[in-house]
């Protein structure tokens, strides 16, 4: 037998740690004669207990399974908490690397109250801190900076995200760099969608190359740029050409400066703070500050001497009243809003905003404008009133739309024109027109268009229980009561006969004494034909009725076929001015010479003539 197993590797799990190959040696003796001997011997053998016929025993397999499951569970927990574990093999490679930690190492609480005077512990802490700082600096110096700048920016963002309050950290960095608080220069916008032209922006850890490039790239977006770089903070004052929201400003700067949103703070500047304006004005003279463009108006207002003198102008109520009168503003909300918008260009409006009695001024202004308008209306004839209202109508229309609609309702236009002439001149017992008929015939559309162009008033009978529901009749040249029902006809028949006769009536006014007036021309629409009602026989001579029997027509696009617009009525009055017996405005205007508009302000001594 020979040993040929040298250098052969075997599986250690195959029972034995060693393996032997036994090779039998051949014998010349034949076994043919010994076969009988072999059979006679049978199952006899010299080896005892070669085969184990006893029952098998399970052994300790359950313990083995528990050990395997425990090892697997510990491995999973280790993977989940791997950032809290350190590999001993890696730490043993370098003691210096082992001393560096990202998270702060807090002292054990049991040593907080260790008995000591404090001097020795202070020295120990100082030595430990110095040693740790030196080791970190040495490792940083020995290491090479990453080539990828994106990785550096990502590291800055991660450092910011580790802070519990990123905004507070940026505000502290800003005050440390510029010596003034960021919120002292700005006012706060709660919503990121509110638009403003001027924005104060500060950024953290921006590359110098990108800051230099932004000076040119922002020129196309801004009328004024103010820039100062005090590492690691950078401060911008950007006056955009158009209003932008905070979201839009963030997207623009993130694209130009390659920064994350967490690195940016943006708020609009304080426009009325003199200290804030001086910060930007004096800062622009600093050689380290880049400024491009003309100063914004709000900086000029706070810093220049001529603007300061204009700021001292006292508020003049008559100027505000003149503005509201010229622009036909009667309601208090319209006066307040539109006059406040003039603060950028008008010194008196700016003084109005700085006054503490704005609400009182608005009420008094609206009251005075109503007084002037009422006096002007009473001084005008119906011809002058119609001419004045037609002057403000822009665009061109055609008078034939009115004529065609009247004829479409089977009304003789010559008769309608004659009645309409008496109606406009407020002739007694002819100053009330009724348009009746079934629904959807255009009654309200026709009368509302006339009321709109002549700036008339609409009365609602729903308020008839109030003593003042007829008060608008004192402030108009023409009025309308739409959709008159039986109840309203009964009220007119009982209480308004004298008014329809053209006589003076006593009208109750709110917060004022009752006044004596004549009713202006009155338009009525109804679904009832009172001419066939015997109970209203006393109104037959006071009301002129026209029937609208046909439904108002619409084309295939659901648009009206008759254009009852302001332009159509303007063309109608211009075309039929003489037929309506309206006076010539050149005669009333002193042979066509221009008349000076109403002036409710005192002329300045050195003013223009």
UniProtKB/Swiss-Prot annotation:
Motif (Nuclear export signal): 93-102
Protein residues bound to ATP: 437-444
Domain SF3 helicase: 411-561
Name of the molecule in the record: Replication protein E1
Entry's localization field: Host nucleus
Reactions the enzyme catalyzes: Couples ATP hydrolysis with the unwinding of duplex DNA by translocating in the 3'-5' direction; ATP + H2O = ADP + phosphate + H(+)
Job description of the protein: ATP-dependent DNA 3'-5' helicase required for initiation of viral DNA replication. It forms a complex with the viral E2 protein. The E1-E2 complex binds to the replication origin which contains binding sites for both proteins. During the initial step, a dimer of E1 interacts with a dimer of protein E2 leading to a complex that binds the viral origin of replication with high specificity. Then, a second dimer of E1 displaces the E2 dimer in an ATP-dependent manner to form the E1 tetramer.
Family per similarity comment: Belongs to the papillomaviridae E1 protein family.
Posttranslational modification: Phosphorylated.
Assembly and interaction partners: Can form hexamers. Interacts with E2 protein; this interaction increases E1 DNA binding specificity. Interacts with host DNA polymerase subunit POLA2. Interacts with host single stranded DNA-binding protein RPA1. Interacts with host TOP1; this interaction stimulates the enzymatic activity of TOP1.
Motif Nuclear localization signal in this chain: 81-83
PROSITE patterns registered for this protein in UniProt: SF3_HELICASE_1
GO terms, biological process: DNA replication
Region of interest (DNA-binding region), residue spans: 149-312
Region (Disordered): 584-609
InterPro entries noted in UniProt: Helicase_SF3_DNA-vir (IPR014015), P-loop_NTPase (IPR027417), PPV_DNA_helicase_E1_C (IPR001177), PPV_DNA_helicase_E1_N (IPR014000), PPV_E1_DBD (IPR046832), PPV_E1_DBD_sf (IPR046935), Rep_E1_papillomaV (IPR016393), Znf_lg_T-Ag_D1_dom_sf (IPR037102)
